[in-house]
């Protein structure tokens, strides 16, 4: 039996290569980039009980009870807010400036519902290549942080072709679940060591006040030889606003897709 030291584990070797290639694969290296974005935000009321109709924001909206549905865990949910937008996004690095031109948008749902405020909070730019990811006022350690191996355990679980690219599946778990970390898995391209996709939940011990759980899923596309850009993203939030009574909460979902990437084409300052 050959016992390998931790630095010789296949998972450790792979993670070291991912970290070494971060400067190449991180979009922050680019002078500029542009893309068309589609964003869909949805907020559903869940954990609905008999007291729901007496709550202030919906006290006089009993007609909404006709739209009740049942979630996968057999709890009642009520669609509350739906917002969609199509926009053109531009970013330049030095100096940093960005502009988003909304081409089309719509929002439907319950006016003045407390859940609506979370639409803005869900508009996050989660860059997994950063050492720290800020979420709702808390700083989480990324599994791609330069020092991530001191906070996470990594496991090389699988390898396969995704499309025409050979990738490794790297699973990650926090060493201490009370730390602000994630658990999940990522697929890593074997040539560029870029992240092809990642799925992650916040650690069980993370305290985000009203947020019970947060899940993020990202998929990247190689748009040039040394440029990978975020192509698709799903963000799920389980929000509990009435923790003491546990009467109801919210399920928030953001779905994003990006296409028509333009790389390193600078625009005038007055664009």
Give a label for each model feature.
Residues 1-9, 21, 215, 235-247:
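Periplasmic N-terminal soluble interaction domains immediately after the signal peptide in Gram-negative
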Residues 4-167, 173-181, 249-271:
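Structured extracytoplasmic
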Residues 28, 48, 203-213, 217-220:
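Outer-membrane beta-barrel proteins
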Residues 32, 163-171, 196-199, 227-232:
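Short, hydrophobic/aromatic-rich segments at coil-to-beta transitions
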Residues 40-43, 175, 203, 236-241:
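Hydrophobic lipid-interacting interfaces of membrane-associated proteins
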Residues 180-183, 212-217, 251:
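Short, surface-exposed coil-to-beta transition loops
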Residues 184-186, 190, 215-225:
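Extended lipid/amphipathic-ligand handling interfaces
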Residues 190-204:
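Surface-exposed extracellular loop regions of Gram-negative outer-membrane beta-barrel proteins
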